[in-house]
Structures are given as structure tokens and as C-alpha cells.
């Protein structure tokens, strides 16, 4: 079930150079009280990097949705963007993004992309164990709606707000050009880890 309350964006034709903002977080110290860097890369499809945006969120905090909204709405790229793509629903540990609110307040559809099907019950147990406000965090996760499998170079899993799953899947496939994940997310990961560690490591 998709909880998005507005009409989904109607993509009559998805162009190969659709402007995508891909967001990933940098490496961080788990369960710390530090801020973690978020990097957003503006891509034309999966081919050309047009810009880089940054913000920070608190590790295991509750500010990810608001900080991403501020980053997007304050960007000179806003009018060219057609979709936001996130590497997972959480950043900096369990700082959960409410993708319905993100879509509503930016006016852009949101696609969450992960490599493996999330174990929702395990996530819920972890939230209950660690956070007094676990119910609010869990509501944001539930609002992301149904998980859909996408056949690309390798299978990926997506959740969406403000966009039909079939359109989201096509955008994922269009932007997956050089590895098994969409290029905007791959580039965001490389930049975020490189800036934080001095050299990029791992994969998104």
C-alpha cells in the first residue's frame, strides 16, 4: 500500500537524461552523537554529473527528513530536478526519512533503492530496543509503503512516494549504467566516503 496522499507524478515519457538527485550518507561512528555528512549528486540519467549538494544529519537522530528538504528546496538545481533517489530509508544509523513528507514538501517524487529486501520485523525490533520514540520512526517506515523488486543489472528493491512503481523501476534501470546500482547513488557514496575518510571505500 502506498500512503502518498497527492496524485502521483505522471511521466508520459521518461527521458534518458532525466534529472535525478541521488543521496547517500558518509561513514560514521555508530551510536555516537555526531553529525554525519549527506551528499546529493545531480545526474542526467546515469551519464553526466551536473552538481553536488551536501548537508548533515545527526547519527540516530530525527532530522533527516527536514535537512534533506532544506537541502533540496534551497538548491539552484531544484527547477531542473525530476526525482529524488535515496540509498535506503535511513541515514546515520536509524535517522529515518519520511518519504511521503519529503515528496509533498519538495514537489518531487521519491524512490528508495536498496540491494537486499529489508527485514521489516528485524528493523522494528531494533527500533523498539533502542529508541523511546520508536513508534514515530516506525510510522515513517510504514508510510514508505510496499517494497517492489526491480530487475536491473542485478535485482534491486524500491519503495516510492509520488510516482508509480513501474515508472520508478524504469528510472532505476535508466540510471544504472556502470554498476549494479543507479549512478547517482554510486557517485554520492564515492564522494561522501572520499571526503570523510580521505579515500573512497566500499560500495553504496
UniProtKB/Swiss-Prot annotation:
Disulfide bonds: none
Coiled-coil segments on the chain, per record: none
InterPro entries: Endo_dU (IPR002802)
Gene3D superfamilies linked to this entry: archaeoglobus fulgidus dsm 4304 superfamily (3.30.2170.10)
A Pfam family assignment: DUF99
Family: Belongs to the UPF0215 family.
UniProt protein name: UPF0215 protein MTH_1316
Organism listed in the record: Methanothermobacter thermautotrophicus (strain ATCC 29096 / DSM 1053 / JCM 10044 / NBRC 100330 / Delta H) (Methanobacterium thermoautotrophicum)
Amino acid at each position: 500500500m502506498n500512503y502518498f496522499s497527492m496524485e502521483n507524478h505522471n511521466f508520459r515519457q521518461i527521458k534518458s537524461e532525466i534529472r535525478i538527485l541521488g543521496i547517500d550518507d558518509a561513514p560514521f561512528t555508530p551510536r555516537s552523537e555526531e553529525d554525519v555528512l549527506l551528499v546529493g549528486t545531480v545526474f542526467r540519467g546515469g551519464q553526466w554529473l551536473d552538481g553536488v549538494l551536501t548537508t548533515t544529519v545527526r547519527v540516530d537522530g530525527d532530522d533527516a527528513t527536514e535537512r534533506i528538504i532544506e537541502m533540496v528546496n534551497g538548491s539552484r538545481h531544484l527547477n531542473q530536478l525530476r526525482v529524488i533517489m535515496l540509498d535506503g530509508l535511513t541515514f546515520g544509523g536509524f535517522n529515518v526519512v519520511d518519504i511521503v513528507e519529503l515528496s509533498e514538501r519538495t514537489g518531487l517524487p521519491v524512490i528508495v533503492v536498496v540491494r537486499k529486501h529489508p527485514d521489516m520485523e528485524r528493523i522494528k525490533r531494533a527500533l523498539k530496543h533502542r529508541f523511546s520514540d520508536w513508534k514515530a520512526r516506525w510510522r515513517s517506515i510504514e508510510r514508505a509503503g510496499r517494497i517492489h523488486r526491480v530487475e536491473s543489472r542485478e535485482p534491486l528493491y524500491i519503495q516510492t512516494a509520488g510516482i508509480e512503481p513501474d515508472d520508478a523501476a524504469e528510472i532505476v534501470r535508466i540510471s544504472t549504467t556502470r554498476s549494479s546500482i543507479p549512478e547517482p547513488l554510486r557517485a554520492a557514496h564515492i564522494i561522501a566516503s572520499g571526503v570523510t575518510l580521505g579515500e573512497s571505500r566500499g560500495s553504496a
